Regions:
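Conserved beta-strand/loop elements of the cytosolic catalytic core of P-type E1-E2 ATPases, chiefly
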Residues: 3-24, 29-44, 59-68, 81-90, ...
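Membrane-embedded transport module
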Residues: 53, 57-108, 112, 122, ...
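Cytosolic ligand/metal-binding cores
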Residues: 119
Length: 184
């Protein structure tokens, strides 16, 4: 019976990836940013997207595997893994909290309701303008044009400003120390 069937159509479903994402990931990696993907999608889908944007091939860790770990073992797995799949909003939040607890400066980019707990947990929550309103409401930064390509530029500017503040503070403290020394 199957031999008598004739195919009528072929349907292919794939995620559209933003055109600037591969170059943005390359710039972030060049700046020393450790990129992690935390997704609720199927592991093969997440790995495929990571490969298409130029992230190094890495094993995928599922929530079911993470749930079996606790304490230092959980923290070590989170630190060593770059791609997480089949994660719930609560696990996304737990992963972000673990990284922050380990002393990492954690920035989270999300656009959906399921990202809200993790966005709130991150030190810098970033939402896409075309994402869910609640994600934008809880984020520290909203990318108005919904493009990640502005992040490497923001990182460069932030580091430049921080360096200038450091130099100014050092100069100010030196001047004050010399004034106190002159008075004494």
């Amino acid at each position: 019976r199957i031999a008598s069937l004739e195919p009528l159509a072929l349907v292919v479903i794939h995620d559209e990836i933003r055109t600037d994402l591969a170059s943005t990931m390359g710039e972030l990696l060049a700046h020393g940013v450790e990129v992690k993907i935390i997704s609720g999608d199927h592991p093969q889908t997440v790995r495929g997207v990571a490969t298409r944007v130029g992230l190094p091939a890495a094993p995928v860790l599922l929530e079911s595997e993470l749930a079996q770990l606790s304490g230092p073992a959980f923290d070590q797995a989170v630190r060593a893994t770059a791609i997480f799949a089949r994660t719930t909003p609560a696990m996304k939040r737990h992963i972000i909290a673990s990284l922050a607890h380990q002393g990492q400066y954690v920035a989270m980019v999300g656009d959906g309701i399921n990202d809200v707990p993790a966005l709130k947990e991150a030190r810098l929550g970033t939402a896409m303008n075309d994402g869910a309103q609640i994600a934008k409401d809880v984020s520290d930064l909203v990318l108005l044009q919904s493009t990640l390509s502005t992040l490497p530029h923001a990182l460069t500017e932030g580091r430049s400003i921080t360096q200038k503040i450091y130099v100014s503070a050092r100069l100010y403290l030196s001047r004050n120390a010399m004034t106190v020394l002159a008075i004494v």
